[in-house]
Amino acid sequence: MSKITEQVEVIVQPIMEDLNFELVDVEYVKEGRDHFLRISIDKEGGVDLNDCTLASEKISEAMDANDPIPEMYYLDVASPGAERPIKKEQDFQNAITKPVFVSLYVPIEGEKEWLGILQEVNNETIVVQVKIKARTKDIEIPRDKIAKARHAVMI
């Protein structure tokens, strides 16, 4: 996590708590010449356009007051969608028995990406049940080898 995203989380988290929203993810990226601050939010039952607009207004005010980003940027506040990121411990716990996509820093069993059902989570590893040629297999993945994890839509 970058210093900017850490600072933004500190600013945004109290706003989300006041609105009874969950701060799902903060991402600060440069695309071409433009910078984007993308904030994903959620709440019980999901967020709608009005929720995103309200959160965007509150976040914009707080960001202007605290000014943690020196360059001009576009603020994008949205729902995390069906393929929401899995980052926090509670995210992993909530994803047990659900489809996940895991991208790794280094290959495990020759693969850097795994799609399957999250079976187990502990402090050191996760276990994802994957299908390989019509057979299911449990893949144990050390958590420190996970580059990104997200919910997945399996068809």
UniProtKB/Swiss-Prot annotation:
Location of the protein in the cell: Cytoplasm
InterPro entries, sorted: Ribosome_maturation_RimP, RimP_C, RimP_C_sf, RimP_N, RimP_N_sf
Organism, as annotated: Staphylococcus aureus (strain JH9)
Pfam families found in the cross-reference section: DUF150_C, RimP_N
Keyword Transmembrane helix: no
Its job: Required for maturation of 30S ribosomal subunits.
Entries under SUPFAM superfamilies matching the protein: YhbC-like, C-terminal domain, YhbC-like, N-terminal domain
Primary subcellular site in the record, as a coarse category: cytoplasm
A single cellular component GO annotation: cytosol
Keyword terms: Cytoplasm, Ribosome biogenesis
Similarity comment: family membership: Belongs to the RimP family.
GO BP: ribosomal small subunit assembly; translation
Name of the protein in its database record: Ribosome maturation factor RimP
Keyword Cytoplasm: yes
